[in-house]
Amino acid sequence: MSGGKYVDSEGHLYTVPIREQGNIYKPNNKAMADEVSEKQQVYDAHTKEIDLVNRDPKHLNDDVVKIDFEDVIAEPEGTHSFDGIWKASFTTFTVTKYWFYRLLSALFGIPMALIWGIYFAILSFLHIWAVVPCIKSFLIEIQCISRVYSIYVHTFCDPLFEAIGKVFSNIRINMQKEI
């Protein structure tokens, strides 16, 4: 096998293994890959360019983690500390939060990324190789039960409820208001 390329929905070209002789679906696979590689820039399928400026492009943490000094500490009208104390408190809160977050992320960021990467890999693995096959198996197995249940309902319940419906269909109620 040799390295080849394919184009995703966004138009990025990725490297994938290509068979030298092609296959029944793409007999000229190698030649087609060479034509495509001349036209576009190649991206690796397992790497993604990350944005170092906008680190929350999907806005996951907008309403949870975005805590500023004004969200935590507030002095009501008529109860104010000295202006210097207020400014120093603001600076202390902001700088402490900023640098302590950086310290925690430096110490625990990579281990937590490793743990969460392993967790989501296990979760993906279980979903792909256990959950979906179990659900498909259950749906296949439940079809025979649903057919038996359907026959039971049509054989026993439908005639019973039709008979009850015919018995009660002739009941008439007349409401009269007496003056």
Swiss-Prot record:
Modified positions (N6-acetyllysine) in chain numbering: 5
PTM text: Phosphorylated at Tyr-14 by ABL1 in response to oxidative stress.
GO CC terms in record: acrosomal membrane; caveola; caveolar macromolecular signaling complex; cell cortex; cilium; endoplasmic reticulum; endosome; focal adhesion
Signal peptide positions (record): none
Positions of region (Interacts with SPRY1, SPRY2, SPRY3 and SPRY4): 132-143, 168-179
Major localisation: Golgi
Protein topology in the membrane: Peripheral membrane protein
Topology, Cytoplasmic side: 2-105, 127-179
Pfam families reported in the protein's UniProt record: Caveolin (PF01146)
InterPro entries noted in UniProt: Caveolin, Caveolin_CS
Localisation: Golgi apparatus membrane; Cell membrane; Membrane, Caveola; Membrane raft
Residue(s) carrying Phosphoserine: 2, 9, 37
GO molecular function: ATPase binding; identical protein binding; inward rectifier potassium channel inhibitor activity; nitric-oxide synthase binding; oxysterol binding; peptidase activator activity; protein heterodimerization activity; protein kinase binding
Keyword NAD in record: no
GO biological process: angiogenesis; angiotensin-activated signaling pathway; apoptotic signaling pathway; basement membrane organization; calcium ion transport; canonical Wnt signaling pathway; caveola assembly; caveolin-mediated endocytosis
Intramembrane segment ranges: 106-126
Residue positions where N-acetylserine is found in the record: 2
Positions carrying Phosphotyrosine: 6, 14, 25
Lipid attachment, kind S-palmitoyl cysteine: 134, 144, 157
Subunit and partners: Homooligomer. Interacts with GLIPR2. Interacts with NOSTRIN. Interacts with SNAP25 and STX1A. Interacts (via the N-terminus) with DPP4; the interaction is direct. Interacts with CTNNB1, CDH1 and JUP. Interacts with PACSIN2; this interaction induces membrane tubulation. Interacts with SLC7A9. Interacts with BMX and BTK. Interacts with TGFBR1. Interacts with CAVIN3 (via leucine-zipper domain) in a cholesterol-sensitive manner. Interacts with CAVIN1. Interacts with EHD2 in a cholesterol-dependent manner.
Family: Belongs to the caveolin family.
Name assigned to this protein: Caveolin-1
Organism name: Microcebus murinus (Gray mouse lemur)
Record lineage: Eukaryota, Metazoa, Chordata, Craniata, Vertebrata
